């Protein structure tokens, strides 16, 4: 794991162990936004994963999305370093298909 990924993981983990308890564990998604951002950074790197985490945090609000939202396995098509907003999913969730389908 690269140094930037380790630093991001340490910062997220510090937030989870300190401020998250003070703010309250009231995330509208599963996994929580901090766990989602940590997984996205570990899976896709600091640049792409950081943008994915930011998009998730922006969706987590009273009028945003809720429920199961997993980190995608592959980066979205059309995402590139010079178009960082394309890494994030700004609407909707990435949930598994219902069991009957």
Swiss-Prot record:
Q: Which Pfam families match?
A: YidD
Localization in the cell: Cell inner membrane
The protein's matches in SMART domains, at most eight in alphabetical order, are given as: Haemolytic
What PANTHER family does UniProt report for this protein, alphabetically? MEMBRANE PROTEIN INSERTION EFFICIENCY FACTOR-RELATED (PTHR33383:SF1)
What organism does the record attribute this protein to? Answer: Methylobacterium sp. (strain 4-46)
Give the highest taxon in the source lineage.
Answer: Bacteria
Q: Which protein, by its recorded name, is this?
A: Putative membrane protein insertion efficiency factor
UniProt topology in membrane: Peripheral membrane protein
Name the family.
Answer: Belongs to the UPF0161 family.
User: Record's Gene Ontology CC terms?
Assistant: plasma membrane
The free-text function statement in the UniProt record for this protein reads:
Could be involved in insertion of integral membrane proteins into the membrane.
Primary localisation category: membrane
Question: Is Repeat among this UniProt entry's keywords?
Answer: no
**InterPro entries referenced in this protein's UniProt entry, alphabetically:** Membr_insert_effic_factor_YidD
* Entry keyword set: Cell inner membrane, Cell membrane, Membrane
